[in-house]
């Protein structure tokens, strides 16, 4: 279910900082119309860290309603408190999400045994397909391949979004547990090499603004058209880099705003791009024909 070209969709806000439901619904339609296979609300790119519980539920509920079963919805429900993650995952299930994306505990930096028990507790308590999310650059700790492999045997654990940047780690999971768990790229730069090793797709940032091209590359890999996939991959590199010119999701939200897809409103502590980075972003977007020079 959670394979292919998946988007870590942005959460639009209005000028007063409120969730912009109307624009969010349009963004979802834009994604589905351009071939995106799965919508992932309330992830890192969706600024989930600045949403309160009511807003979190509202974003997921709106997403499920607008998608209307056209594609699966993988709802971000992670927390560094296990009880809170269980609560958020239960809420997502009640609202009709097809699965939950669960970031590994951040800030409190548990041991590998603690990480294992955290995810096992969620999987034991909520009968919903769950995709683990390993992103050491955000959480301050790496979930090892061994820990992921231990969790892969749980019937509710169906995937892992691997954003460690370590192809050896991803390959180890695929080699030892690929028949039990789908390994999904969490880094647009590494989607092609990870899929070449047996990964099942990407949860993409870049797909927010160029979903058709991300889908085309994933499709090319799945159809063993590696020359085509390589061409698309190399063509997208500058755009991938531009999406991380500053902290995600600032560049991608600004890019989407420049393209007229949404406003560029962020919530503190995220702020606007530095002027020189904004100029660089505009140059890249213009080069791809996404905005006028």
From Swiss-Prot:
Active site: 133 (proton donor/acceptor), 161 (schiff-base intermediate with substrate)
Function noted in UniProt: Catalyzes the condensation of (S)-aspartate-beta-semialdehyde [(S)-ASA] and pyruvate to 4-hydroxy-tetrahydrodipicolinate (HTPA).
Name recorded for this polypeptide: 4-hydroxy-tetrahydrodipicolinate synthase
Subcellular location: Cytoplasm
GO biological process: diaminopimelate biosynthetic process; lysine biosynthetic process via diaminopimelate
Encoding gene (name): dapA
Protein origin, superkingdom: Bacteria
Catalytic activities: L-aspartate 4-semialdehyde + pyruvate = (2S,4S)-4-hydroxy-2,3,4,5-tetrahydrodipicolinate + H2O + H(+)
Residues under site feature: Part of a proton relay during catalysis: 44, 107
Residue positions binding pyruvate: 45, 203
One MF term in the entry's GO annotations: 4-hydroxy-tetrahydrodipicolinate synthase activity
A GO cellular component entry from the record: cytosol
EC numbers: 4.3.3.7
Assembly with partners or alone: Homotetramer; dimer of dimers.
Pathway(s) annotated for this protein in UniProt: Amino-acid biosynthesis; L-lysine biosynthesis via DAP pathway; (S)-tetrahydrodipicolinate from L-aspartate: step 3/4
Chief place of localization: cytoplasm
Alphabetically ordered keywords of this record: Amino-acid biosynthesis, Cytoplasm, Diaminopimelate biosynthesis, Lyase, Lysine biosynthesis, Schiff base
Keyword Amino-acid biosynthesis: yes
HAMAP family attached to this UniProt entry: DapA
